Amino acid sequence: MKKLIPAAFLLLAFVSCKKSTDNLQLTPISDYAPLTVGKYVTYNLDSLVYLNFGTIVAHHLYQVKYETTDSTTDGLGRKGFRITRYIRTLPSGSFSPDNTFLAVNTGTTFEFTENNLRFLKLVQPFEDGKTWKGNSAIDVSSLGSDLQYLYDWDYTYDSVGQPKQVGAFNLDNTVTINQRDDSFNLPVITSGPNETNIATRDYSQEVYAKDIGLVYKSFLHYEYQLAYHGYIGYGITLTMADHN
């Protein structure tokens, strides 16, 4: 009987671990990234740009609609969906298409390709503190690349399954992905013996809601250079305004 006890404990441990793993896998990627032709989300877009050689910050306001317009196949032969982005300058104006993207649900991940850059937006399991290299499929090391700031980002889940207010919407079930919050040599000092030579700031966060998809995005990337006492970079904020 004594010899059977270790085996029994091993069996219980195996069953316990299996149940724990199964529970973590219960939430499918499609819950937070539904891909159905005809589905759309409209956002208020605040676009930040630097003007006058980086000495002036300007904000441009638009509305954009991301609509799943067709199913397709990606370069790896996997089923994907074409996402068409439409834009207008006034809420009362007409939308005009201005870009297309590719979305792929692999069953365990959600990939989104824009401007030939493939981002690993979501992964299983949905668990607070879960981290992954969301930009690992992007070539940031080629000679002359201006994408080096995307290197080695750790995407991290936070507030999985929690309610959140986004714009005018009170959402019951969301997940926040903290993608980057990094700075170098800030604040910028523009005169004196300690004048800043170079400084950088990178911030990115996204929020997805169950049965809707992306509902909020905040992104900022800039670099300050003493050579021209100005900034290079851009930022965007997307806040959901409508969806079906």
Predicted regions and their residues:
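Sec-dependent signal peptide hydrophobic core
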Residues: 5-9
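C-terminal motif of bacterial Sec signal peptides marking the signal peptidase cleavage site
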Residues: 13-16
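Positively charged n-region of N-terminal signal peptides that target proteins for export
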Residues: 1-4, 18-19
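Conserved functional acidic sites
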Residues: 18-244
